[in-house]
From Swiss-Prot:
GO molecular function annotations of the record: protein tyrosine phosphatase activity
Family annotation (SUPFAM superfamilies): Phosphotyrosine protein phosphatases I
Entry EC no(s): 3.1.3.48
Gene name linked to the record: ptpA
Similarity-based family: Belongs to the low molecular weight phosphotyrosine protein phosphatase family.
UniProt superkingdom: Bacteria
Organism: Streptomyces coelicolor (strain ATCC BAA-471 / A3(2) / M145)
Higher taxonomy: Bacteria, Bacillati, Actinomycetota, Actinomycetes, Kitasatosporales
Name the UniProt record assigns to this protein: Low molecular weight protein-tyrosine-phosphatase
Length: 164
């Protein structure tokens, strides 16, 4: 049974596609590609059908990550097929939990940086790099990479628990 993760930011052109690309690479490197699917979406549909921001694509490519992406808006009906919904900041977390049709679905929503032990008790938001320069995208990637290690460990535990 496939474990499904969806990363969510505002417009699905910067942070969430970056998190999706990094996490997919981690999943493949861990040999879990046949068991875990990663996807992304935005809380809004302003960029629906567009590719990722060119700065996101450039930073990912410079760090060896691939990305084939078309932006889309998160839909309430997706909760039923997802195991984990990963929000990139507290605003997304609140919006997604409000959208969740059940308490069980709301419990599926977590902040990405909550998986990074280095920020325990600190600011768990991944800042939106959209209005800044390349440095903001590099910083975003660093945060995503740091949290992806803990996220992979948590997902691996869930996947192995299902197999037991």
């Amino acid at each position: 049974m496939t474990y499904r993760v969806c990363f969510v930011c505002t417009g699905n052109i910067c942070r969430s596609p970056m998190a999706e690309a990094v996490f997919r690479a981690r999943v493949e490197d861990a040999g879990l590609g046949h068991l875990v699917e990663a996807d992304s979406a935005g809380t809004g549909g302003w960029h629906e059908g567009e590719g990722a921001d060119p700065r996101t694509e450039a930073v990912l490519a410079d760090h060896g990550y691939g990305l084939d992406h078309a932006a889309r808006q998160f839909q309430q009906s997706w909760f039923s097929r997802l195991d984990l919904v990963v929000a990139l900041d507290a605003g997304h977390l609140r919006a997604l939990r409000r959208l969740a049709p059940t308490e069980r679905d709301a419990a599926k929503v977590r902040l990405l940086r909550s998986y990074d032990p280095a920020v325990a008790g600190g600011d768990l938001d991944v800042p939106d790099p959209y209005y800044g320069g390349r440095d903001g995208f590099e910083e975003c990637l660093e945060m995503v990479e740091a949290a992806s290690t803990g996220l992979l460990a948590a997902v691996r535990e869930q996947v192995e628990g299902r197999a037991a």
